[in-house]
Structure formats: C-alpha cells, structure tokens
Amino acid sequence: MTSTPHHPDLRSQLETLTTEAFRPELAEIDQLPTLDIARLMNGEDATVPAAVAERLPEIAAAIDAVAVRMARGGRLIYAGAGTAGRLGVLDASECPPTFNTGPGQVVGLIAGGPDAMVTSIEGAEDSPELARADLDALALTADDTVVGVSASGRTPYAVGAVEYARSLGALTVGLACNRDSALAAAAEHGIEVVTGPELLTGSTRLKAGTAQKLVLNMLSTITMIRLGKTYGNLMVDVRASNEKLRARSRRIVALATGAADDDIERALTATDGEVKDAILVLLADVDGPTAARLLAESGGHLRAAMAAALG
C-alpha cells in the first residue's frame, strides 16, 4: 500500500505546526558570517528554558504520578521516533549507572528498534501498530508509565503508544512542542513545551529537541529523588562499574559522612561497595548486614533507614 494519497493532508497538517513555521527573516542566514549564525543559534537556544518553565506544574504532576507507580514496581517507558525516540533511549540508558536502576526499570522505545538510533527507518514513525507490538513485547502492566515523546505531537508511533498504554490502564504522559497536540490530548498528563519555529525550518532536533532533553532530565531525575535514589544532592545509588565511578563512590561517602579515607574504605568493603549502605554504616554505627536490612525495610530511602537506626 502506498502512502502517497496522504501527502497533501500531511503537508497541510505540518503547515499548521509552530515547530514547522518558516521564518522569512532568516531566509539569508547562509550568507552570514559563522559567528553571527552562532550568535543567532545561541539566542534561539536561550529561549528554551523559559518555555519549559511555563510547563513546570504539569511536569511536577506527572513526576509525582510516575513515582507512585514506580514505588509499586512499575517501569518508566519512553516511546518516540527519530530525535524524540533517541532522546528517550539516551535518558533510559543513563539511569542504571546514575541511579542503579534494575534491568528494564527505565526503557526507551524508538520506532524501528535499535537500528533506528543511528539510521532512519522509513515508515516506522507512521505505525501505531508497531508501537502496540513494542509495548506488548514488554508485557505492559497498570503500574507502568508510558511517556510518548514527539515534537510535532502528531507522530503516529508516539500517539499510538500512549493510546494503547492508556487502554491497558498504564499511566500516560504526552510530551510535545506544539499546542493542542493529539499526543497531549491522548495522555493522562499532557506536557506541551512550545519552543516556536526553528532556526532551520522544521529541524526539531534543535530547540524542540533541547526542550525534550530538559523535560526528560526532570522526569527521570526528580522521580529518582522521590524514590530515595539520592541523599541530598548526592547520587548515593551510583553503580561503581568502572574506576571513575569507584572514585566517585568514595567521594560521595566522604561528602555525606566527613569520615576519614581509611574508614570509608572499610565501610565500602563491608558493604560490597554499596554507597548507601556504607554511609549508613558510618553515620549510624551499624554493621554491613544491618545497614542492608534497614535500607530494605525503608524501601531504599537512606534518611528513613537512618531514622530507624538512630531512633
């Protein structure tokens, strides 16, 4: 089946999107000196945080809802195509080393599968059926959250993922960069960060992509803070999988406890390198197994485990 008959309709849709708008004042940008183009681009990028700031109440409400589900064992699943999909995969892939999340706890789905991370997969973004199949492969539950990500807010893969997830009782979030988007309307929590026309007409990897990155940073990071994955602003659930991270682990324990280096090494040895446990050993003067038990009983929240140990 050819998709040619849909092209006029799609063109008219795109022409109504702010992210696709043409800016005649930039029509001769290619004639400018490089530094002037860089200044223009930097000025455009500087507008993105303000656009995100306008949506902070919606972002916070979504985060609180996600944290409730994840505390029950649910997963955070991003679904998008192209740049939006890649940003979701990026955010998901950074959660295990940063927050010691379990395998599959934060998932990035991109239309067309892993190959689409580096290669354009023709037609994949136009398939809501593909989104349903990808979610079926994850055996979605009502405790899971699906975040559809699409600059236009109309990408069939992202909209299809959200609609299907919602039909199964999962929590849904729709992140778009245009007002009145189908994606935000389909989701329980709609977040529309309107970044305006791009420097290059329709190149939504620019301001829209930056906005999506900022919002995804918030979704994962603040959710993990709510889940007790941090102690203050320290990454106490960091996974020490290489020498840099092992050094960071020692530094985090030092910052949290003020203990001497020898004491930190002993605590990390006694807790098999677990930063949270080592901090509890040092601050509450308990042994490794007791620290592990207290943390398990407090759902991994270090402050709660500390209160139990000292109370």
UniProtKB/Swiss-Prot annotation:
InterPro entries on file: Etherase_MurQ, Glucokinase_regulatory_CS, MURQ/GCKR, SIS_dom, SIS_dom_sf
Active site location: E94 (proton donor), E125
Domain of life: Bacteria
Enzyme class: lyase
Catalysis performed (reactions): N-acetyl-D-muramate 6-phosphate + H2O = N-acetyl-D-glucosamine 6-phosphate + (R)-lactate
Record pathway: Amino-sugar metabolism; N-acetylmuramate degradation
One Gene Ontology term from the biological process aspect of the record: amino sugar catabolic process
CDD domains: SIS_Etherase
Alphabetized UniProt keyword annotations: Carbohydrate metabolism, Lyase
Pfam family, one: GKRP_SIS_N
Domain SIS: 66-229
Gene3D superfamilies the record matches: 1.10.8.1080, Glucose-6-phosphate isomerase like protein, domain 1
E.C. designation(s): 4.2.1.126
Keyword Lyase attributed: yes
One Gene Ontology molecular-function label: ether hydrolase activity
HAMAP family: MurQ
PANTHER family: GLUCOKINASE REGULATORY PROTEIN (PTHR10088:SF4)
Quaternary structure (record): Homodimer.
Function: Specifically catalyzes the cleavage of the D-lactyl ether substituent of MurNAc 6-phosphate, producing GlcNAc 6-phosphate and D-lactate.
Note: A lyase-type mechanism (elimination/hydration) is suggested for the cleavage of the lactyl ether bond of MurNAc 6-phosphate, with the formation of an alpha,beta-unsaturated aldehyde intermediate with (E)-stereochemistry, followed by the syn addition of water to give product.
Protein family according to the UniProt entry: Belongs to the GCKR-like family. MurNAc-6-P etherase subfamily.
Name the UniProt record assigns to this protein: N-acetylmuramic acid 6-phosphate etherase
Organism of provenance: Streptomyces coelicolor (strain ATCC BAA-471 / A3(2) / M145)
Source lineage: Bacteria, Bacillati, Actinomycetota, Actinomycetes, Kitasatosporales
